[in-house]
């Protein structure tokens, strides 16, 4: 697949490592401060940014993924924030998923990554309510988790290392593999490859991923850009 790829605007944060489009705009998570910002999804200004609607602090740490569902934000805390800032008592020791109030940043739920270790990506399943997809990096797998009892219902293998952003489609699930600059569409049942997008070196590196209408958006934690992929 060879879609159109274009830079849209720069994040309000220097290290955006997760994003999620909602009806209000696009949420962006900062890996350093673990704040989340809601910004307008519009043409960028002369300064290369869009208008900030609000931003809120969270109890996440080393945030490496963002999703939205059940009227809440879901943040992937990839261990403590010691690489970026002073450690807080709320930091995760290893990977955790936090359900967060989008108005206040209050933690509503907190769950361990299935089988432990770190994580870079998650996706609230809008085709099957009550489920969320969560990566377990050390095992190179993606789990479908039932939220009510935090139990793994299904697992598919991931084809490459350093998996990142995740987007569920009706007929598959897209997963970013940052180091390989690939966004792979996987079959839901067995994880077989259905399609792929190669992001060449002329474009920012893909990290977080979100659906945006019929298109995809991704953010680059190294350059701060938000990028659009048009099919």
Stretches found by the model and what they are:
Residues 4-10, 47-56, 106-112, 151-157, ...:
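A short beta-strand motif characteristic of beta-propeller blades
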Residues 10-23, 58-71, 77-80, 113-128, ...:
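Beta-rich, blade/repeat-based domains predominating
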Residues 25-28, 73-75, 131-134, 173-175, ...:
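Conserved beta-propeller blade signature
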Residues 32, 79-80, 138, 179, ...:
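Residue-level signature of beta-propeller blades and closely related beta-rich strand-turn architectures
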Residues 35-37, 86, 95-98, 141-143, ...:
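A short loop-to-beta-strand structural motif that recurs across blades of beta-propeller domains
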Residues 40-45, 101-105, 146-150, 187-191, ...:
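Short loop/turn segments that connect beta-strands within beta-propeller blades
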Residues 76-93:
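Short, conserved, GDST-rich strand-edge loop motifs in beta-rich repeat architectures
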Residues 205-231:
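Blade-level signature of beta-propeller repeat domains, shared across WD40, Kelch, NHL, RCC1
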């Amino acid at each position: 697949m060879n879609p159109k790829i274009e830079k849209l605007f720069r994040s309000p944060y220097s290290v955006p490592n997760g994003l999620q489009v909602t009806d209000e705009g696009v949420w962006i998570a900062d890996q350093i401060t673990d704040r989340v910002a809601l910004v307008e999804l519009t043409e960028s200004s002369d300064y290369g940014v869009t208008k900030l609607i609000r931003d809120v602090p969270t109890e996440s740490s080393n945030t490496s993924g963002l999703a939205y569902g059940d009227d809440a934000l879901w943040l992937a805390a990839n261990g403590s924030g010691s690489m970026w800032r002073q450690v807080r008592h709320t930091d995760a020791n290893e990977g955790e998923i936090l359900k967060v109030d989008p108005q206040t940043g209050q933690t509503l739920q907190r769950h361990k990554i299935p089988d432990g270790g770190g994580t870079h990506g998650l996706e609230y399943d809008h085709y099957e309510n009550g489920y969320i997809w969560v990566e377990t990096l050390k095992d190179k797998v993606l789990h479908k988790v039932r939220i009510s009892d935090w139990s793994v219902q299904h697992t598919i293998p991931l084809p490459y290392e350093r998996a990142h952003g995740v987007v569920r489609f009706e007929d598959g699930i897209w997963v970013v593999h940052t180091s390989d600059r690939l966004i792979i569409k996987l079959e839901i049942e067995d994880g077989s490859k259905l399609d792929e997008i190669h992001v060449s070196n002329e474009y920012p590196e893909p990290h977080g991923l979100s659906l945006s209408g019929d298109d995809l958006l991704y953010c680059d934690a190294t350059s701060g850009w938000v990028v659009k992929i048009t099919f």
